[in-house]
Amino acid sequence: MNSREDILKRIRENVHERYDMPEINVKGIQFADPVEQFINACKTISGATVSFDTPPSDDQRGETSTVRGDIAVAENGCVWIPQREDDRSFLFKSEHLNIIVSRKDVVNNMHEAYDRIAASTEYFKDYKFGTFISGPSKTADIEGALVYGAQAARSVTVYVVP
């Protein structure tokens, strides 16, 4: 018996009273207009959004890295981006990152985002990596000097399209 098993055995032997686990039913926050809340959350975290009635053209995208986001979260302004390319480093090396997300893919909260990811059984078969990205990279020193782009993009713009 190794140390771990010995410790667990001793714990089990000394547990005298067991309790049923309570049911935890956490409901995430809901918004009347998740898209509007998502836009506000992006502004709060120093990001930007552009809402289009039609997808942006190449000249509107500019000369920055552009990627499609699968899920946008109204609660905190983050976007789920799965790995579709072999190289994912552009998500973090770009000076400016544009993310395109559909209005129908804006959810209220992280609970709904993870439920949507989990509901897609093909998701993790097709993708090796996924990340939530939220606003530009920021850091501050002890004096409170805020620096953008310290670990990733200096600016993030989310294009909300139909």
What does each model-found stretch correspond to?
Residues 1-162:
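The feature marks the mature, well-folded catalytic cores of soluble enzymes
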